[in-house]
Amino acid sequence: MPLNFLLPGISMKRVSQLTALALLMGLAAASTSAADTMPTLTLSTLQQHNGVAIDTRLSAFYNGWPQGANGPQGHEPQALNLAASWLGALNDEQLSAWAKLHNLQASTPIALYGNADDNAKVAARLKAAGFTHLSSLGDALSQADRLQKLPHFEQLVYPQWLHDLQQGKPVTAAPAGHWKVFEAAWGAPKFYLLSHIPGAGYIDTNGVESEPLWNKVSDAQLKAMLAKHGIRHDTTVILYGRDVYAAARVAQIMLYAGVKDVRLLDGGWKTWSDAGLPVERGTPPKQKPEPEFGAPIPGQPQLMLNTEQARALLHRQDASLVSIRSWPEFIGTTSGYSYIKPMGEIAGARWGHAGSDSTHMEDFHNPDGTMRSADDIAAMWKSWNILPNQQVSFYCGTGWRASETFMYARAMGWNNVSVYDGGWYEWSSNPKNPVSRGERGPESSR
């Protein structure tokens, strides 16, 4: 008789932990094409046998947004996030790399939780990849006090939340007062004209940064830009972009200016489009100017460092100046930009990862473009001695990638973070500034 024929008659609630383990190791090798064919374990049983829980929900729910009214918030302790919706974007090699990164072996006990359909999809894919000891986590999300979440998950909103807010429905972490939505990008609103989130305004990044070094504009210019778009210090601003880092650049500068509540649509325009939510065409709506910001600018000057302030962070154990540039940029085989000629890196800077080149941020993204798990990011940084109790300032070429990373660190609860505005462009413009080139490891920044 096939082993899976035995499953319908077995109640895992009535068997001992030893029997549960036996079922996990023996029966899970049977078909896992649907969640109801897998044995069920509790978290304590899974932990006793060094197993791993995998959350198959969207990262928004993993991070802390409730999936329904008054629903649980967060994820099980040390759970990994492998959303069923990502599977189409993950080839076998990428899935294998993901498993290797998280030390998953074919023999690792794995318990899935989420909805049944998502669990079944992830189980089938894992089984095809050689993972045979699969189960369902029977008590998942049942104990609110043990759940973990992103400390400031509300700063990274997700599409349905924004749509519900626009529809006037009650939402978790609702803005305290007036709120606005903007798309941010460089230059004229080309893509915006064709399709954008209904009601969204448009902000050209040239309004917050300028040549010759693409540093932020003066505080007076920043005040004028905010007034033009009807933004006060107490306006909740929700930003999105075709490129997340464009929206993040604007968001970070708004926080510097003193806008108290600035949020990003996690994953940007792509996540809205993928969700199949309404869109509209046309020119940006006229914004009613707001002549008074209502507070001094800058409200948080510590969020933006100049070159001398950045230099003061080098070679310190209580601080990190962090390069958010690709590895080829970090070791000096490319500058990453057509308009930046010098190649190399700030001597003593720590590598915070980024992506394959100056226009990508894969190291920080899930397959759908949303923020990777905080545990993964923190582990990546820890390997280069970048720690949450330090004073940390991020930089890249001109500030976009650094700003996206800043927004993630802020959501993770890293309190003493900033952006070195000038970045490699300004640092390399002075030949007296020390530069490093070539392959090197974390010890180079000690």
Predicted features by range, described:
Residues 5-6, 10-32:
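Gram-negative bacterial Sec-dependent N-terminal signal peptides
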